[in-house]
Each structure stands twice: as C-alpha cells, then as structure tokens.
Curated annotation (Swiss-Prot):
GO terms for molecular function: DNA binding; DNA-directed RNA polymerase activity; ribonucleoside binding; zinc ion binding. It comes from African swine fever virus (isolate Tick/Malawi/Lil 20-1/1983) (ASFV). This is DNA-directed RNA polymerase RPB2 homolog. Belongs to the RNA polymerase beta chain family. It is found in: Host cytoplasm; Virion. Keywords: DNA-directed RNA polymerase, Host cytoplasm, Late protein, Metal-binding, Nucleotidyltransferase, Transcription, Transferase, Viral transcription, Virion, Zinc, Zinc-finger. The lineage of its organism: Viruses, Varidnaviria, Bamfordvirae, Nucleocytoviricota, Pokkesviricetes. GO terms for cellular component: DNA-directed RNA polymerase complex; host cell cytoplasm; virion component.
Length: 1242
C-alpha cells in the first residue's frame, strides 16, 4: 500500500512574475489576515466552543455520579436488612439559552438585551437547562437488590454568563441597522461579558503545553536534595478534559521518584521501578530496557544511563523499604493502596479479608489507569504503552542530566499555550458545578433515603428530591460564583463556604477609545508566580522578549512600569488562537499510513538499531517511522490541500531527538505566512547533468546548468484583489499561497524578513527560504499606530502603546444610549495626514496640529508645551466628560420626590431643592455645587408626629465644576428594585496642566496658553498650534515624529494622505523634492517672526503638522486631590483615597525626594501628618491617662487624679487615638509618659 501523497500540483515557480510587488502591497496580506479572523474573533470562537461542546462534554462525561454509602435507616425490619444504597445519576441533556430577564410587572420572562443589562445593573446570563437519569439501588444482606429509576425532565438549574457577540447573544448575526435599534454599537465586535451592569474582559492566559515533558534544574535549598525534575501534565483530548500531573525527580542520592498529583491519590514520591512492577514488569533488565531501549548498545550515553538506573533501583527509601526488592505485584499494589489510596479510610483493616484485598487492588489499578498518563489510554490494555512512554520520559531526563540536551526553555512559546475565555471559564465551571450542583443533589438523595423507606420511593419522589436540591440555593450559587470568578479577580473564591481556586484572569473594560477596547481583548497575561515578584535572574528573564515572540506576541507593547512589565503582553496583528481540532480522524489517518509503524509493532531495540523516529499526535506516542523529514514534508503538502489535514494542524519535526509531532490541541498561537517555492529539484537534476557532462569532457557542460530560483506566488494583482474585497485569506490558503504556522513549526522554517530580503537571495541556493514574512507582523495593533516606529527608540514605542490607549476620542458609537462613569467624548477627531495600517481598524483619536519646534520663552521645557489660545478657542481637543449618579431605593419606605420641608426633617443645610421635578433635576438643567440633583425621602416607621413623617436622603451635587443633566432614567434592578440613574455632562476644554502626546510617545503638558497675537508666525502668516521644545527629541530619540512632521508638511501642501506604517521604505531624496516643489527648503525649515517683537528669528524653524492626542488625565479632576480639604474617613479622620471617593493623591517617591532635596521636610510632615489626621489630645501628667477637655466650658478634668490633675496638650493623630481605644476595649491599658516641664526664668 502506497503512502498517501498530495494530488495538487502547482505551476513552475519560474513562471511567477511579481516584480511589481512592493513592500506597501505586502500590507494587504495583513489586511486579509485581520479581515479573515477579526481582531477578536478567536475570543468569541473560544466561547462558542465552550457553549456548543465544552459545557455539554463536562456535564455529561465528567459528572457521571456513582457513589455507595452505608444505609443509616433502621426503622423497620427491612431497613435493618439493607446494607448500602448506591446512588447513580448522569445528565442526558444540557442546553444553554440566550439571556432572559424576569419582567416583574407582567410576571413573565423576556429577552434581556445587552444595553438593558448595562443600564439596570443586571448580568447578561443565559438559562442553563439540564435533564438527567437517576438510578437508586438498595443492596440487602441476603443478596437481594432493589432498583428505583427516574427520568428528570429538562428544567432550569441556573444561569451562565454569555459573551457579547457570541452565538448565544441576541446580537449574533444582527445587521448594523438592527444593532442600532436596540442601542448597540453597530461596529462593535463584542468579546466581553456584562456582569452586574459592568463590562468585563476575560484575558488570554499563558499556560504550559500539556502532554509535554518540561525539564528544569531545581535550586538546591535546605532540606531539599532534588537535582532535576521533569513535569508532565497529561490530558486526553485537547480542550476541556480533566488532566493529571506526574513529577519525575532525580535526587542527589541517585534515586529517581515519581509523584502522581490527583485528588484520588495521596502525594507521595514513589520509586520509579515500583510503577513498572505494579503493572506486571518485574525484571530489572526489562524495566531498564524501557528507558535505554537497547541494553546491548555499548555507547557511552547508554552505559552511563544504565549505571544511573541500576543505582536508583538499589537506593534505599525508608517509606518503601518493605517492597524495595519485592517482585510480587499483588503485594506491591496492596502496599501502595495502604499508603496512597484515598477511596478507603483504613486500607489496613481489610488485610484479613482476601476478597476485600483483591477488590482494593483492582480498584487501585483502575484508578491508576485513569490518572497515570491518561492521554495514552485509560484502560487495562494500554498499560504496556504507558510503561514505554514513562520510560521515554525518564530517558529524556537522563539526557538532560548528562548535558546531551538542554533543559526546557520556560519562556519559549514552543512549549506554551494561550487559553482563551472558553478554557478559563471551563476550569472555573468544573469546580463550581461540582460544589453547587452535584454535592446538593447527593445530599438531597441522602436526606430523601433517610426520611422515606426505599420500598416506598416513587418516581415522583425522586424527581422532587432532585429538583428541590437545586431549587434552594444551588441556582444562585452557580450563577453568583461564575459572576464572582469574573468580577472579583481574586485567586480564591468562596462557594458554599468552600474555597475554590479561581482560574479566570479578568480586567474591567474601560472604554476610553476603540483602541483601548481592542487592546484589552487581545491581552495575554502570564501567571503571577513567586519568581515573578522577586529580584532574581529568573524574574528578569521571564520579562524579556523571547526569540519565539515575533509574529505571535507584539515585541513592543507591554506595561512600561511596575510588576506587569513583560508579564502583560499583546498579540501581534496577524496572530490568532486556535481551538481544538478533530484528533481522532487524523490519528486514524496516521495509523493507516504505511510509512508509520504502530507502537505495538515496534520493539525498543528496533528504535535504536534501525534509527526509527517517533511519531506523536497531541503528545500521544502512536508509532515510529523511518524518515521523519519526508513524513513531515508530505503531510505539510497534504495540509496545503486542506482535504485530509486541517489547515491549522501543527506539524513539527524535532531533529535533535528525531520526533515528528502533530498538534491539534486548544490554545496554539498561529499566524499566516506566505509560502516560498523553489525549483530545487530541477536545479539538482541540471547540476547532476552538468557534472556528468564535465566528467565526459564536454566543453559546453555549463549549458546544462539552470539558475536556482525561489519566490512567492503572491502577486501585486492579488494585493489589489484583497483591497477590493474579491480575494480573502481563505482563498490564498486554498490556492497554496500561504499557510498557518505555529511557534513549534516556525523552528523548521527559514523565513525571509521581507519581500526585499527574498529578492536579495532569490538565486542563493545556500539560503533556501520556506516562507516570506511581512515585517509589520511582529507588532501589535497599538504599536502599529505609531508612524515610522522602526525609526523611533523602542522604549518610546512602548510608551505610545500605553498612551494611545488613554487618548480621548469616540469610545463607542452607542454613547447616547449608555450611562458610563468617567467617560470622555472628544468632539473633533481627524484622520492623520500620515496614517498607518492600524487606522483601518480603529477610529482616529486626535488632531493634525501645526507644531513649531523651537524655544519660545521659559514655558516649554522638555516635558511642557506652549498652546495657542486660538487653537483652544477653535475647539482643539475639546470634548464632553460624563459622570453618572446612581441611587437605589433600598426599601418600600423610600421614594423619589421633592422633600416637603413641612413634614421632612434632616434637610441638608444650604442645599438648593428648587430644581427638582418629581425627584430629579430635568434634562438640560445646569447644576452647581450645593444643588440637590436626586430627591429621595424615607418614611419614618411608627412616627406619630405629623410634622416629621419623612427623613431626607437626597443626593447633593458636590463638585465645584458646573454640570448639565444629560439624561435621567429609572430602571429596575434584578430583584425589581428601582434605581435613579442620572448622567451628568461637563465641558472639558484644554486646560493648563492637561497632557497630550504624539504617536511617537513624546508626551507633553500644556504649560501656557499664549494669545494669538503673541504666537510666532511664518512669512505666509502660518501660526503653530503647539510649540514644542526641540531638546525633547535627541534624548528621547523620537525620529519617527520628525519624519512624520516632514512628510505631513508635504502631504498638507499637496493635499494627499500617505502611509507611514513601520518598516515601509523612506525615500529622503523624494521627500526633499516634494518640499522643494512647494517652495520650501529641502529640510522643511522656515523663516519665522517673533509674535511679541515682530523680529525675524536668527535660525530657521522646523514647523509642520504632527498628529497629537489628548490624554485622559484632567487637571480639573485632580485639583481637589491636592488641596488641604476634602472627604475624610469617619473613624480615623484620614483622607480617603481613589477618584471614586474623591480622595487625595498618593505622594510618590519622586515627589518625596524633591521635597527632601529642597530641605522642605516640614512640608512633608505637614502634608503627611498635620493635614492628614492631626489632632490635639489631652493627657494627665500624673497618671498618663487621657483627660477630659471642654472648650466651650473651660473644663479640665482627669477621672483618676481629680483636682490634682496636671493636664497637658499633646500633638497626636486620630489613628493613634483609635488604636488606643481598641486596645482598651480588649482590656489592655495604655498610659503615656510625658517629658517633665521645663520652666525658663523670666
């Protein structure tokens, strides 16, 4: 039988003509990749996979409950004969519907739309319906069994959070017009969750690759004699199945131990050879052969391995000393059962019963079959395969010990996976479902069997017990816990008073602009470990850019300061995250391939002696082949056809260990690359003919030679078709022009950095490229916003990726229908004159400002900018700032309305109630500090006084900045409680102290608003909008901004928009010619006049348009935070922190250093102590106890000393006094010792 080979043949590469293809045309390939998957399509696809496959698979397959417990009921004679009861149930149907909401006024359920959930503080969750089969079996002492069965019809158990835009969302497949009608942004892709009215994003989370051995040297610590360890997490399937971990350790004593981590297995380091003996392989030679493969080989590596293994077998272990030399597998299994089994409380009690011992042994083996390397199989007939695989793992660890191979690179994406929202929520769902649903059902049945005789049970009793167990608190527990896992961000959440590790990493979605929203959805977080927070070499290495990042992780975007540097990353622009593929069909295809010998047909000796390569699929060892390179290449060609092998299949040949790996698991990063074809076969034949002709003495032997050619089949016409929308990425994949490559397979590729590099080596046979890349693909969306980023210092590009997410703009198009807290909506936004490819996917967030690079007075130092007052008056960076006020009616006694002063007490002094109409200030009204904006009163229960029926609980506006009431709503909450919701609007023009930034990360602060009459101007009368200090560029090396200004100047004069995407070629000569055509100097500098004196400047000034963005850091919001007054804590009197509570600013280290350097220590004391919670306390000198002081009536009194008291005033702090009160409440007295009085002579 011939191996399966590709059927499609491609035309000769010599016939491909793409000389007209430019670097700018290659950008269309990025557009095709983004248009195919969408910037966040992987996130929605991951959640859809969870809904369609994950939740049904978890509930149906992982929660088949089968427990037996001793019957405690003894009311009748039949009860006394009943020994035990077996409870079995499994779920037969799982269905998750679209979100619904109970309409309390009509008493029915209606569809819950996303905006309704936002306004009403609801959670966008869909009902979870389950159906089940229950079997109850009673076992009697006389051997009789009695069975009761019941089918549970589908009913709602709880609700599950639904992702906006998924196939369970009401906006799924809606047109833009339909989205507008329901108050949604028509261009919004979704990908986030709405929980309790807030929007939350589940981050992509890094994880190690399962079914892969990760080998690491272990740091020698006190009490730990471990040298090296290999960790292996085995997972059958590829997405939602349970996993099991084993840890193989090599100790300083020479021992090799295996630790199995499972809930059904106690943690214990078992000598490795006992695992082999327990599964029936008792001979030492047979055991060692599974590791070294060939005992007869005399190679130095083989000899050294045998020495290590023989020594490890004879190393004594105190715990396993009784079975160290035991060859009887039954005794070994029984000994392990006593040590590590969890399913029997006292295994040693069964030693006298042979039947019980046999049952325990078989049960132990059955458990081991399921938890030991389950990806290799979970039945008894797969034990030999597992032992061979376990031997291979130990073999690889020994190779690392001998320095033949290096340990695993922890930071390489070759051995990592990125798990999306589907996998993260599945992990949380497993633990929460077990605690909140399964446990109550079991307890419900136990309670039923305790109260009702088994023979009296009916199908109705069983159904009612099943439903009652879930109708109490389970529904709310499951829903509340899933919401808590998304909202809290805590590492541990409580479910039914049980702590559960939270596997979900989330962040609140702050809609500052569209770029910020997309960046939040493309965030990749690394697990926060103890190593990450330490100042160690490991903490530094895990934050660096790894060689496997380019093309998959943006090499520029991360946090610029703090612990998240290098730990919070972004996907590159073309990177995508794969869901799990169909493993079974590919496995069957590989096993039927004649080139692959199945594992059972290959002996260990043949692997070494015949030089066979191992073949794996999702980490499962399925067989061997003779030519690994040919096998990998053949299946890659089949993948290009897309009929037999899925296009997203990873095919990797590890040449160091000669293994071929096929991966279809979830979480693989992938990106499209253009394929490079060549004529190597023709070239080799021609060279062979030329060599033969030369041997025969043919003088014209060189005529047989042909040039080597390598090229891509991508042409400029295809680039035009992509931009026209007639050609897609799927078409390119189907035509064999591009394919998807993962970080593993990238190690088998030689990728040309650009089309220019490919052409440079077009005829170089020593550098045969497999693919050609687009240079811009190494950056993410936020980094691609920066023009000519390759000319700017990388650190500045990193700053821009963070500043670009803070800029003001249009945060969404549905803003009139939303009520958001602290949102800025900028009025005028322009497309930049020098745009980048990123602007095809995000709306603009800035203005083309005329910038003069000069020193003009003392107000524009490096970090400050002079702004033209005329620019501010024309609406430059002007916008609207929104706040919300939300008030809930806490009980039936509260109501909205204008308080009547005749029957309401506790009215706020000095407050203005006149603007209230039906409890709310009307829309369009200007409110100022002291105005009541929401009127609320509460009826006093039991009050008989007609003049004091109500108490005032109104909300007063407390800001100095006037506001306009923009919207007023009265939505109903989840329990039909009424809210008062008000949106306030503020005009936010550019003020002194506000921040702005260019797209090159050059940030500046508005230091002076200069009148138009004082601004400098050119000979043509052009005045700059901003004056930037030229010294800010040499130190920051923002060359990209200089190029942007020069190109923007030419574009403005010629009325065109050009592309300034990073890595595009820059023709300086052509740029100078464009400026000369418009009558300017070749470098763009112009002669300018001083606006204050009217004189010429001695030097030419560089002036031109630069795209600037206003950052959402407003001085008006921070003004109250630096004052000596503001809200304080009611107990300690200290200032509150945080903007939400209108608290003060944190005094940072740099501010502290500045004040210390200036000798202003008293200022620090004043701000940190006196203005914080400073107070005067009165203490008696005689006894040291606090004294009583009344200022209005000059009373000085000590409760201990009475008239003999000697009272002194002491500078103290409110927090100190609170602490003393708490200690006295705990019956611990604190006395103060004051210094003696010093009397100075008159």
């Amino acid at each position: 039988m011939e191996p399966l080979r590709p059927q499609i043949t491609y035309g000769p590469i010599e016939a491909v003509n793409n000389e007209e293809l430019t670097e700018a045309d290659m950008l269309s390939f990025i557009s095709a990749a983004v248009n195919s998957t969408g910037l966040i399509g992987y996130n929605i696809k991951s959640f859809d996979d969870l809904m369609d496959n994950g939740i049904p698979q978890i509930v149906k397959q992982m929660f088949n409950v089968d427990i037996t417990y001793k019957d405690q009921r003894d009311h009748t004679e039949i009860d006394k004969l009943r020994e035990s009861v077996q409870i079995q149930f499994n779920f037969t149907d799982v269905n998750i519907e679209r979100p619904q909401h109970r309409n309390y006024s009509q008493g029915n359920k209606i569809n819950l739309l996303p905006n309704k959930a936002r306004l009403c503080g609801l959670s966008y969750s869909g009902p979870v319906n389950l159906a089940a089969e229950v079997i109850l079996t009673a076992h009697y002492s006389n051997g009789r069994q009695e069975v009761k069965r019941a089918s549970i019809p589908p009913f709602q158990v709880s609700t599950f959070p639904i992702m906006r835009g998924s196939n369970r969302c009401h906006t799924y497949h809606l047109s833009k017009t339909a989205k507008k009608e329901i108050g949604e942004d028509p261009n919004e892709p979704g990908g986030y969750f709405i929980a309790r009215g807030g929007e939350w994003v589940v981050d992509l989370l890094e994880n190690i690759r399962f079914n892969t051995l990760h080998i690491h040297y272990h740091t020698m610590q006190q009490g730990n004699n471990e040298i090296i360890r290999g960790e292996f997490i085995s997972q059958p399937g590829g997405a939602f199945e349970n996993s099991s971990q084993i840890i193989i350790r090599y100790m300083t004593t020479g021992a090799i131990t295996i630790e199995i981590n499972s809930t059904k297995f106690s943690k214990l380091r078992i000598p490795w050879y006992l695992i082999f003996r327990m599964f029936g392989m008792t001979g030492d030679d047979s055991i060692i052969e599974q590791v070294v493969f060939d005992l007869e080989s005399n190679s130095p590596v083989n000899t050294f391995m045998i020495e290590i293994l023989e020594k490890s077998i004879h190393v004594s272990d105190p715990i396993f000393q009784p079975v160290q030399h035991e060859l009887n597998r039954e005794k070994i299994i029984q000994f392990l059962s006593e040590k590590v089994s969890k399913f029997v409380s006292n295994p040693s009690a069964y030693k006298s019963d042979e039947n019980a011992v046999q049952y325990l042994n078989e049960r132990q083996l059955t458990i081991l079959d399921k938890i030991l390397l389950p990806h290799m199989g979970q039945t008894a007939d797969t034990r030999v395969r597992k032992l061979r695989f376990l031997g291979l793992l130990i073999h690889k660890i020994l190779l690392v010990i001998m320095n033949v191979f290096p340990p695993t690179d922890r930071d390489s994406y070759r051995t990592k996976r990125v798990h999306g929202s589907g996998v993260s929520l599945a992990k949380a769902f497993k633990a929460i479902f077990n605690t909140s649903v399964i446990a109550p059902i079991i307890n419900g049945f136990k309670e039923l069997l305790k109260q009702t005789a088994f023979e009296d049970l009916t199908q109705r009793n069983i159904i009612e017990a099943f439903s009652a167990a879930l109708s109490k608190n389970s529904a709310s527990d499951l829903n509340r816990s899933m919401e808590q896992s998304i909202i809290s961000g805590n590492k541990t959440i409580m479910v039914r008073q049980r702590p559960i590790v939270n596997r979900v990493s989330t962040q609140s979605l702050e809609r500052k602009n569209l770029l910020n929203t997309i960046s939040a959805l493309r965030t990749v977080n690394t697990h926060s470990t103890t190593n990450a927070s330490k100042q160690t070499e490991r903490a530094d290495m895990m934050r660096r850019v790894h060689a496997s990042y380019p093309g998959y992780i943006c090499v520029a975007q991360s946090a610029d300061t703090g612990e998240k540097v290098g730990m919070s990353k972004q996907l590159a622009i073309t990177a995508n995250v794969c869901t799990a593929g169909e493993v079974l069909s590919l496995k069957q295809r590989l096993l039927s391939d004649p080139a692959i010998q199945q594992l059972a047909d290959v002996s260990n000796k043949d692997i070494v002696r015949k030089g066979l390569a191992r073949v794996f699929i999702n980490g499962e060892w399925i067989g061997c082949c003779t030519n690994a390179f040919e096998l990998a290449q053949r299946y890659r060609m089949l993948r290009r056809e897309g009929k037999i092998v899925h296009p997203h299949t990873t095919i990797y040949w590890d040449s160091m260990v000669d293994e071929v790996e096929f991966w279809l698991d979830v979480g693989r990063l992938t990106r499209p690359l253009l394929i490079v074809d060549n004529n190597i076969e023709k070239y080799n034949k021609a060279c062979y003919k030329a060599a033969e002709a030369r041997k025969k003495g043919d003088k014209d032997w060189e005529k047989h030679k042909i040039p080597f050619i390598q090229n891509t089949r991508f042409t400029s016409q295809m680039a035009k078709d992509i931009l026209a929308g007639t050609l897609t990425l799927e078409d390119l994949v189907a035509q064999g022009i591009c394919e998807f490559i993962t970080p593993e397979e990238a190690e088998n590729c030689l990728v040309a950095f650009s089309i220019t590099e490919l052409r440079k080596h077009k005829h170089d046979v020593t550098r045969r490229f497999t693919h050609v890349d687009v240079p811009q693909a190494i950056l993410g969306l936020a980094a691609l916003v920066s023009p000519y980023a390759n000319c700017t210092q990388p650190a500045r590009v990193t700053y821009e990726t963070n500043q670009g997410r803070q800029t003001g703009g249009w945060y969404c198009f549905s803003w009139p229908y939303r009520v958001d807290m602290n949102r800025f909506f900028q009025f005028y936004n322009e497309m930049p004159l020098v745009k980048t490819i990123a602007h095809n996917y995000v709306i603009p967030n800035g203005l083309n400002t005329i910038v003069a690079y000069m020193i003009y007075g003392g107000y524009n130092q490096e970090d400050s900018v002079i702004v033209s007052q005329s620019f501010i008056d024309r609406g430059g960076f002007a916008g609207t700032f929104y706040r919300e006020e939300k008030v809930e009616l806490e009980s039936d006694i509260e109501s909205f309305g204008k308080p009547d002063p005749l029957i309401t007490k506790n009215l706020k002094p000095g407050a203005n109630y006149e603007k209230l109409v039906d409890g709310f200030v009307p829309v369009g009204t200007v409110v100022k500090k002291g105005d009541i904006i929401i009127g609320k009163v509460a009826k006093i229960r039991g009050e008989k006084d007609e003049l004091n029926k109500y108490i005032d609980r109104s909300v007063m506006y407390g800001f100095d900045e006037p506001a306009v009431v923009d919207a007023v709503m009265r939505p109903h909450g989840p329990n039909d409680e009424i809210f008062g919701l008000m949106r306030l609007r503020y005009e936010r023009n550019l003020n002194i102290g506000d921040k702005m930034s260019s797209r090159s990360g050059n940030k500046g602060i508005a230091a002076l608003a200069l009148p138009t009459s004082d601004m400098p101007f050119t000979e043509d009368g052009l005045q700059p909008d901003l004056i930037v200090n030229p010294h800010s560029h040499p130190s920051r090396m923002t060359n990209g901004q200089m190029i942007e200004t020069t190109v923007g100047l030419a574009n403005a004069l010629q009325g065109v928009v050009t592309d300034g995407t990073a890595f595009l070629p820059i023709n300086v000569q052509l740029l100078s010619e464009r400026l000369a055509q418009e009558g300017l100097r070749f470098n763009g500098c112009q002669k300018m006049f001083n606006g204050q004196t009217g004189e010429y400047f001695d030097a030419a000034i560089f002036i031109g348009p630069t795209y600037h963005q206003r950052l959402q850091k407003f001085v008006l919001d921070d003004r109250y935070a630096v004052a000596s007054y503001g809200p304080t804590d009611a107990l300690t009197g200290q200032p509150l922190d945080g903007k939400r509570s209108h608290g003060g600013l944190r005094l940072g280290e740099m501010e502290h250093w500045v004040l210390t350097a200036q000798g202003a220590m008293q200022t620090i004391i004043e701000k940190s102590h006196d203005d914080s919670d400073g107070c005067i306390s009165y203490i008696c000198r005689n006894c040291g106890e606090p004294a009583i002081y009344n200022a209005s009536h000059p009373i000085y009194k000590c409760m201990n000393c009475d008239v003999q008291a000697d009272i002194s005033m002491v500078d103290s702090r409110r927090s100190s006094i609170v602490f003393q009160h708490e200690m006295r409440a705990a019956n611990v007295n604190i006395t103060s010792v004051l210094s003696p009085r010093v009397f100075q002579p008159a």
